A protein has these predicted regions:
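Small-molecule kinase domains that catalyze NTP-dependent phosphoryl transfer to phosphate-bearing small molecules
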Residues: 7, 11-22, 95-140
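RNA pseudouridine synthases
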Residues: 47-50, 57, 63-67
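ATP-dependent small-molecule kinase phosphotransfer cores
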Residues: 1-52
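Conserved phosphate-donor/acceptor-positioning beta-strand/loop module used by diverse small-molecule
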Residues: 67-90, 96-105
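C-terminal helical "lid" subdomain and adjoining coupling/linker elements of P-loop NTPases
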Residues: 153-160
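Short, amphipathic alpha-helical "lid/cap" segments that border enzyme active or binding sites
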Residues: 41, 139-147
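Conserved nucleotide-binding/hydrolysis micro-motifs of P-loop NTPases
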Residues: 60-61, 77-83, 137-138
Length: 160
């Protein structure tokens, strides 16, 4: 008995970690990181075809674009000093030097991952529908701004 793509997707989303690793066997011969990337790419596409959702990172902008799936792609940034301050606020015991080092290392890791799997430059404004500096609006203001933009996009699509 063959499962429909939707029921297969439902089954995959409810698997244990051990079962997910077995499921990766369809990417036989790939290293684990590549298998994870291609598996999550399939999941992102399947989810995007079924419903609206928010995903942070995972090269979702490129994955959805390359698969012709309509989406809104947003890149949020802030000056390094504000990011350091925020990192200190949410991670007790982190001093400025460690926070700066952590963020620089994280940015480098994100850029490498994104560049490797997409062939694009991470953070390049041409890759996104909207780029926003959260320092200009604060966290809550940035969220409100994005929600208004998404609402306008949905209203526009309804009227077409």
């Amino acid at each position: 008995l063959q499962q429909s793509p939707a029921s297969e997707f439902e089954a995959v989303t409810h698997m244990s970690l051990k079962d997910h690793i077995k499921y990766f066997s369809r990417y036989h011969g790939l290293n684990r990181q590549d298998a994870v990337f291609f598996n999550q790419s399939d999941l992102i596409c399947d989810m995007a075809k079924k419903e609206d959702f928010i995903i942070m990172g995972r090269c979702a902008d490129a994955i959805l674009t390359n698969n012709g799936i309509p989406h809104i792609s947003i890149y949020i940034t802030a000056p390094i000093e504000q990011r350091i301050q925020r990192a200190i606020e949410v991670n007790s015991g982190l001093d400025r030097k460690k926070a700066r080092h952590f963020l620089k290392k994280l940015d480098k890791k994100h850029a490498h991952y994104y560049n490797f799997y997409t062939g694009r430059s991470w953070g390049n404004a041409n890759n996104y529908d909207l780029c926003i500096n959260s320092a200009s609006y604060g966290i809550d203001g940035t969220v409100d701004f994005i929600l208004r933009m998404i609402g306008r996009d949905k209203d526009k699509k309804k009227s077409e």
